[in-house]
């Protein structure tokens, strides 16, 4: 091919892909193409960007290059693409040693537009000429007048304040620092908030000039496209203008340690949190993963040693009382992968015992051998995931591209980790001959390149750091001359003016845009059929699943009281993690993964669109399996639902402690979701339900039962037994299946026998109930047939939950009453306008929040929220001003086309088989018809400016509900007590 040197080609049969590696002769760019029939095309360009300090220059550059370029001189082309393209993926990511810019689309014209915008962004960005972009995306001094305090602000600055407020993120940062002190991994590529303000504009420009060059680029094309045509365009449009250079971006190996290193750090906890049993102990060791087989084997060891229920290393630490949550595992994707064992909820004084137990346990496993069933189960699970290639909302081509970078960046072939089938076959055989035990000895035991990181709690550390920063900035302000203060004020105002100034229409039109005619008019339909077998409703969706069945047993929770629902929420955590009548929980886990691609238990509330303010609560058993394992899997489901030994108080204590830890970690990682859910619980039955089984109320519940368990360890198990007995009955159940016709037929054939066996289980439980408690015979299980009252809602209120965080998650939620304001597809267009114009401009661009979002449901729920937000009062004021903005909304025809295309892009997200299985249940329970889907799409396509203005009443109603929740900085919440009905410490 002209101007390219073909380095090597391979056929990857597992992926039905023809792969080629090229080098662009003039610029030195590396190109990897993966040609196949997947219409969800992916383009990615990555640069090796080793961090030389912790100013976050790589991360800030990632943000900044997407703020306009020579060919597309808009202020925010990324946002314009987000709201005006049919992308199936659009983002950019900073890693410890690379920065990646991937896009994906199923539309050929759209895909070419996305490639063009991203390539111009990385090679010709405006940010290297305009310091205001660095100020906005990275950091700047902020002072509006002489009386104003001097502050730091910036999107990345605030994002990383949020990251550094999370103890697990802090721990990960210092693990890398401890293991690789002489390499780029010792620095924080995302940026340390204490160091980010040291980044100058000259350093920023120099970083881009050095690393953002084709000679340092790794370009990937994946999918159904004319590769020769794409490469010719790449050459002509961009690569040919560059001459090859040496970017000097090689990442050296860290010289191996000769002895264990130790590092001690602190993390912030609330004023009332305990300092005992609140330390993280982390043992970490650098491992060599020199080929794919070894890489997969280390990942499997992660599961066998740490992640599986009853994993021996995890169990040994828990039983020794060192930590109540053990996690870690194999971390790759960097030059030198490492293996970690982390104990959360430990004491620093136990560090020697922690190391001793790890060493003793591993040596015992090497000597006596690992559980072969556990190894085979882990291999089976990994291979199932690999073959299924279902990565949720991420296109599989993106996952393959990122996997290719795990080797390509370090001088190895990009397809090395994509060939897995033979490796799995070899590992099954090797497991019989001590391969994994030898790996433990070589990589984990006989390896001095290790570090112990101790992360200790410190009360009020966040507040101390905030006060120190305020003092530093006050001193800085006091040391300024009058001219310097005026210059700072002028710069702040100039930046605000720049942020508020809209991009000219002339520049907006330089960005390529599809037309409405490029969009399909037909909504994607649901195709389930309802059938009754043995008087059980089956919801059957027939489609090509490549021999995989997606099976869901759905149990209506109407039989449970409000007091019982949180117990059901905990039940989904317990099932398959305790002994049953036939299996230990360790053997049960292996049996499940030997015969399935995973079994999950979940709870969700589905609004009834035929009866507003009503919903259906469902406890679901979700499993994916190959058809030939159906009989065994159904037997396992019966066993788990009916013979779990809830009376095992020792095991229950372990699960409870881990659940308490994991729920806190979830809140720390996704505070915006919890804030929205909590606010919705004030007025919405579905919101209240989700709060009880997985929100802040559930977190409080877990803490209560954990505290009570020590004094009364038997009641919890009995309560779960009663909940399971009431819930898992035929009168509560319907089944949904997504599979090919032969898979559905196989289920229908086996179901009558399974149901009879299930009935026998229930009869046995009836006898057991008589033995356990004669008073319980009255038959609470028949409550499914009764009409239960809706959940008690607590009415509108604004709550503040203080955490040891430097940023906030600020949510408002409410109801617009669909009987007065009928749901319309125009609300999807309004969502795009708010997410990428109004909220984006006010909360992210001007306010410095990392994220902002809005949403409107078919049943009348609406919400607004911010993510890693330095503000609180200003954000709430922004929400309150929204109805006026919508009433006076104006947009050109081109702008409306963009909003409509963005809304359609969300509707047309490719559906995996697992997505289809979940959506079928949701649509069935909520009564969403194909006609409603088509009507919604028609309304989206026909949305006008007038339609948007008419939605101001909807938003006004949402805000008038008065429900709000803020999770975050105690300093901010305490400073604005008047905004809240109640405030409290979330973590106590």
For every predicted segment, state its role.
Residues 35-37, 44-46, 157, 161, ...:
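His/Glu-based metal-binding/catalytic segments typifying zinc-dependent metallopeptidases
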Residues 1-42, 258:
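Non-catalytic terminal extensions that flank enzyme cores
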Residues 57, 61-65, 571:
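Active-site His/Glu-centered metal-binding helix of metallohydrolases
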Residues 153, 205-237, 717-751, 960:
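Non-catalytic, conformational "gating/processing" segments within enzyme and secreted inhibitor domains
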Residues 143-216, 220-238, 242-270, 275-277, ...:
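Hydrophobic, small-residue-rich alpha-helical packing segments that form membrane-like cores
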Residues 40-50, 76-124, 131-142, 169-194, ...:
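M16 family metallopeptidases and their MPP-like homologs
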Residues 439, 443, 702-717, 721-727, ...:
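Aromatic-residue-lined binding/catalytic grooves and analogous aromatic/hydrophobic interfacial grooves
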Residues 206, 218, 227-246, 368, ...:
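Extended, regular secondary-structure scaffolds
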């Amino acid at each position: 091919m002209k101007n390219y040197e073909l380095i090597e080609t391979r056929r990857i049969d597992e992926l039905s892909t023809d792969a080629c590696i090229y080098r662009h002769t003039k610029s030195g760019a590396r190109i990897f193409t993966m040609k196949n029939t997947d219409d969800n095309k992916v383009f990615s360009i990555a640069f090796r960007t080793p961090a030389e300090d912790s100013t976050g220059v790589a991360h800030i550059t990632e943000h900044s290059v997407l703020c306009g370029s020579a060919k597309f001189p808009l202020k925010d082309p990324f946002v314009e693409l987000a709201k005006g393209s049919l992308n199936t993926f659009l983002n950019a990511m900073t890693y410890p040693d690379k920065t990646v810019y991937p896009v994906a689309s199923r539309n050929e014209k759209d895909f070419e537009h996305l490639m063009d915008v991203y390539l111009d962004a990385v090679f010709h960005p405006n940010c290297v000429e305009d310091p205001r972009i660095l100020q906005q995306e990275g950091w700047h001094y902020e002072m509006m007048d002489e009386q104003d305090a001097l502050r730091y602000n910036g999107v990345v600055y605030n994002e990383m304040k949020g990251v550094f407020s999370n103890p697990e993120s802090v721990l990960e940062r210092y693990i890398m620092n401890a293991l690789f002190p002489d390499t780029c991994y010792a620095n924080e590529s995302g940026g340390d908030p204490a160091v980010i303000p040291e980044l100058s504009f000259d350093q920023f420009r120099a970083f881009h000039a050095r690393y953002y060059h084709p000679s340092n680029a790794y370009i990937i094309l994946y999918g159904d496209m004319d590769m020769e045509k794409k490469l010719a365009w790449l050459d002509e449009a961009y690569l040919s203008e560059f001459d090859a250079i040496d970017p000097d971006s090689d990442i050296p190996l860290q010289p191996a340690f000769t002895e264990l290193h130790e590092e001690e750090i602190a993390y912030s906890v609330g004023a009332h949190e305990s300092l005992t049993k609140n330390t993280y102990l982390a043992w970490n060791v650098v491992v060599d993963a020199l080929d794919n087989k070894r890489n997969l084997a280390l990942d499997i060891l992660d599961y066998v040693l740490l992640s599986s229920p009853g994993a021996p290393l995890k169990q040994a630490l828990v039983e020794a009382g060192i930590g109540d949550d053990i996690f870690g595992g194999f971390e790759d994707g960097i030059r030198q992968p490492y293996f970690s064992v982390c104990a959360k909820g430990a004491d620093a004084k136990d560090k020697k015992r922690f190391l001793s137990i790890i060493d003793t346990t591993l040596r015992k496993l090497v000597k006596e051998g690992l559980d072969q069933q556990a190894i085979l189960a882990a291999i089976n699970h990994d291979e199932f995931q690999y073959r299924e290639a279902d990565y949720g909302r991420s296109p599989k081509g993106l996952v393959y591209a990122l996997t290719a970078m795990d080797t390509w960046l370090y001088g190895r072939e990009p397809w090395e980790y994509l060939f897995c089938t033979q490796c799995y076959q070899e590992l099954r055989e090797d497991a019989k001959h001590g391969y994994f035990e030898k790996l433990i000895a070589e990589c984990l035991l006989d390896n001095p390149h290790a570090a112990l990181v101790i992360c200790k709690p410190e009360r009020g550390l966040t507040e101390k750091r905030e006060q120190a920063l305020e003092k530093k900035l006050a001193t800085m302000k006091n040391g300024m001359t009058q001219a310097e203060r005026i210059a700072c004020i002028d710069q702040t105002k100039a930046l605000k003016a720049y942020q508020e100034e809209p991009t000219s229409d002339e520049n907006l039109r330089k960005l390529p845009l599809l037309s409405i005619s490029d969009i399909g008019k037909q909504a994607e339909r649901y195709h389930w059929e309802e059938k009754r077998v043995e008087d059980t409703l089956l919801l059957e969706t027939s489609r090509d699943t490549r021999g995989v069945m997606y099976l869901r047993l759905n149990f209506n929770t109407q039989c449970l009281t409000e007091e019982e629902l949180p117990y059901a929420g905990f039940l989904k955590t317990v099932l398959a993690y305790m002994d049953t009548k036939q299996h230990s929980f360790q053997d049960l886990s292996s049996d499940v993964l030997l015969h399935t691609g995973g079994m999950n238990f979940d709870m969700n509330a589905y609004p009834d669109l035929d009866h507003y303010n009503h919903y259906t609560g469902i406890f679901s058993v979700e499993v994916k399996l190959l058809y030939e394992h159906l009989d065994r899997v159904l037997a396992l489901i019966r066993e788990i639902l009916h013979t779990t030994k809830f009376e095992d108080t020792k095991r229950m204590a372990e699960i409870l402690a881990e659940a308490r830890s994991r729920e806190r970690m979830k809140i720390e990682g996704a505070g915006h979701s919890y804030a929205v859910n909590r606010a919705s619980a004030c007025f919405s039955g579905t919101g209240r339900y989700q709060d009880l089984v997985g929100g802040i109320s559930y977190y409080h519940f877990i803490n209560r039962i954990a505290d009570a368990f020590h004094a009364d360890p038997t009641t919890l198990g009995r309560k779960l037994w009663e909940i399971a007995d009431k819930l898992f009955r035929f009168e509560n159940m319907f089944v949904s299946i997504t599979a090919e016709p032969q898979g559905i037929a196989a289920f229908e054939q086996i179901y009558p026998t399974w149901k009879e066996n299930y009935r026998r289980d229930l009869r046995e439980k009836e006898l057991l109930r008589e033995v356990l408690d004669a008073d319980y015979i009255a038959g609470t299980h028949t409550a499914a047939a009764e009409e239960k009252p809706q959940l008690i809602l607590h009415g509108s209120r604004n709550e503040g939950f203080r955490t040891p965080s430097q940023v906030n998650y600020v949510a408002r939620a409410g109801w617009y009453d669909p009987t007065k304001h009928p749901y319309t597809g125009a609300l999807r267009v309004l969502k795009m306008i708010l997410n990428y114009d109004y909220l984006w401009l006010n909360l992210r661009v001007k306010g410095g929040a990392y994220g902002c979002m809005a949403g409107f449901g078919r049943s009348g729920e609406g919400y607004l929220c911010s993510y890693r937000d330095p503000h609180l009062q200003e954000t709430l004021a922004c929400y309150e001003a929204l109805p006026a903005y919508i009433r006076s909304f104006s947009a050109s025809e081109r702008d409306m086309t963009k909003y409509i295309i963005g809304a359609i892009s969300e509707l047309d997200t490719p559906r995996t088989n697992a997505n289809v299985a979940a959506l079928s249940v949701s649509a069935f329970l909520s009564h969403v018809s194909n006609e409603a889907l088509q009507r919604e799409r028609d309304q989206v396509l026909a949305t006008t400016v007038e339609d948007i203005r008419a939605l101001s009443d909807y938003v006004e109603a949402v805000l008038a509900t008065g429900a709000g929740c803020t999770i975050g900085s105690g300093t901010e919440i305490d400073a604005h007590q008047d905004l809240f009905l109640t405030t409290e410490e979330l973590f106590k």
